[in-house]
Every structure is written in structure tokens, then in C-alpha cells.
């Protein structure tokens, strides 16, 4: 599990590497499009989730890859099979979808995030890239997503978590690459770096540390 941590906007986009190599299953690889990466089992769950709020859970789960039934040239969407799979997969991560036909817009933010992740895993993702998966979530919803990320990793899935929230990344990560204003400050194993050190290396980290010291001093000062 790798965690990319940095301040807001420092890791907003990705490009072809200026140097180095991308190795997938022991082979040097060059991706010409996102589809190339997807074909090799590398899936990305973007910050906007790519879900349609007015469409059902099932429709979002299978979007563009619907199971079909019927004779050749007259195939139709197998809604019964799709509903069953969608409900089962969501149930496996602890989310009870009583009606798979319900609109995704009725789900909580954490449930929608888990739906997007579960969809990627179901369709064969071996490497999962998550872009700010907890940025718009409350404490409880974020914990649901983080627990699912840990569960996915424990089942052999490689997870790359992109976030500016060290407090979410540190408990679930094994190694961390720190980015500051678009530049890498290095990759560290968890045993070699503390949460506080990670935070201080990020853009704005030193300012936050200074603020904490100032606030402590203010609290110690006698009231006027």
C-alpha cells in the first residue's frame, strides 16, 4: 500500500514520467491512455466518483459493462442478475442495499465512495488508485471508507491513496511518498517516519506546527 500525501493541488494531475520506468508484473510499460492502464488491471476512482446520482445503484455499478441475456442480436439487460450482484458486492463491505434500484443520490457520501471502489474491484482491478476518497466525508463516513480500503489491501489488492489528509493516510498506509508543490520529497516506510514528520514535510506543515505552538502558548498565558 502506497500513500501519496501533499497539500491541496500539489498532486492534482498525472503525466508521463520525465524519467524512470513504470513496471507492471515485471515488464516495462508505457500507457498511451487510461484504457491501457485499465486493461492491465489499474483502476482509478476519481474524486467526483463518476457516478450518476439519478441512476440506480445497479446501473451505476455496471455502467457500460451490463450483463446481458437472450439470443444473439436480441440481447437485453439482465436486470435480475445485475441487481443480485450489486447487492451482494455492497453487502460484502457492510453496506445494506435493500433496493438496488434506488437512486445513488439517496446514498451517503461514504456509501457512494464504497460503491465506486467496489465496482472497480469487481471488474478486475489489481491496482487501485484513489483520488482524495475521504475529502468530502464526515468522520463516520470516512472511517467506513478507510476500513474498506484496509480490507481490500488485505485481500492482495495494491492500493495507492492520494490525499492531503495525513490523519487518514497514516493509519492505513505502509509506505508514503511526500509531495510538496509538485515535487517528490521522498518515499518512506511507515517505521521510518512519524505522522508529525509527514505533516511537517507537506506544504503548509511548518505553518501548522508553528500555529499549534502559538495556540499552546496562548492557552498558558493568564487571561487579561
Label the model's feature ranges.
Residues 7-224:
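Glycine-rich phosphate-binding loops of nucleotide-dependent enzymes
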Residues 1-6:
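Single conserved hydrophobic/aromatic residue that forms the stacking wall/gate
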Amino acid at each position: 500500500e502506497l500513500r501519496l500525501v501533499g497539500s491541496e493541488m500539489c498532486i492534482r494531475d498525472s503525466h508521463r514520467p520525465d524519467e524512470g520506468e513504470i513496471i507492471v508484473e515485471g515488464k516495462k510499460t508505457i500507457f498511451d491512455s487510461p484504457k491501457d492502464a485499465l486493461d492491465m488491471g489499474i483502476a482509478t476512482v476519481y474524486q467526483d466518483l463518476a457516478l450518476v446520482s439519478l441512476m440506480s445503484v445497479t446501473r451505476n455499478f455496471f455502467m457500460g459493462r451490463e450483463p446481458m441475456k437472450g439470443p444473439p442480436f436480441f440481447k437485453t439487460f439482465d436486470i435480475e442478475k445485475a441487481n443480485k450482484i450489486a447487492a451482494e458486492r455492497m453487502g460484502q463491505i457492510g453496506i445494506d442495499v435493500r433496493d438496488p434500484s434506488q437512486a445513488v443520490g439517496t446514498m451517503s457520501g461514504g456509501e457512494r465512495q464504497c460503491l465506486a471502489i467496489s465496482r472497480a474491484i469487481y471488474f478486475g482491478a489489481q491496482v487501485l488508485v484513489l483520488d482524495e476518497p475521504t475529502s468530502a466525508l464526515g468522520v463516520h463516513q470516512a472511517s467506513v471508507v478507510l476500513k474498506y480500503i484496509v480490507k481490500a489491501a488485505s485481500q492482495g489488492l495494491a492500493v495507492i491513496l492520494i490525499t492531503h489528509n495525513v490523519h487518514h493516510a497514516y493509519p492505513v498506509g505502509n509506505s508514503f511518498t511526500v509531495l510538496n508543490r509538485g515535487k517528490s520529497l521522498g518515499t518512506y516506510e511507515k517505521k521510518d517516519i512519524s505522522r508529525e514528520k509527514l505533516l511537517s514535510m507537506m506544504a503548509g506543515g511548518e505553518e501548522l506546527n508553528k500555529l499549534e505552538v502559538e495556540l499552546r502558548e496562548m492557552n498558558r498565558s493568564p487571561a487579561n
